[in-house]
Amino acid sequence: MRLDFWSKIRDVPVEDLIFLDEAGVNLAKVRLYARALRGQRARGTRPQKRGKNVSMIGALALKGVVASINILGATDGLTFEAFVIQKLVPNLWKGATVVWDNSTIHKGQEIEQALREAGVQLIYLPPYSPDFNPIENFWSKVKNTLRSLGARTYQALDLAITKAFSQVSFKDIRNWFAHSCYCILPI
């Protein structure tokens, strides 16, 4: 299946690839590592209540984040469909190729029809292949930034997510695409 994926995607220009995925965060994000003086324990506080999860949906292209949204709670099929139709499709261009995993919320006739009408190709990642999806690295950096910012309210978390997105550089994105085996010519 992984070979079939590469045979479908190999002729698509890397500039036309858009990777989409969801990630979840909550109010209990804290740093995982700390420093202290020799012989002393590093201390910090961690909230006992995590609160509701905040789902982030994002679409990443070589030129940056194409569309994103934060939702309090889990993402279901209707929420995902609304994101694709209202946020993603207006930002797409003819000849673009959207790539996402095989999650059941990604499969809907309305979603596929909206992408077809926009002149966009849809390719599903093979099962168990997050290594082919550069947005996984994007979410990793966003979550690490959120850990260091330590937002403890939903309003602060929303601002922290915006700040974490702005911390991602074009160099980061280029490197994530290259790491996921999408050939990029040097600048």
Sequence positions of predicted segments:
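C-terminal anion-handling pockets and recognition modules
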Residues: 14-17, 135-187
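The start of beta-strands in P-loop NTPase/AAA+ ATPase cores
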Residues: 16, 96-97, 121
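Mobile genetic element proteins and their domesticated derivatives, centered on retroelements
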Residues: 19-21, 58, 84, 101, ...
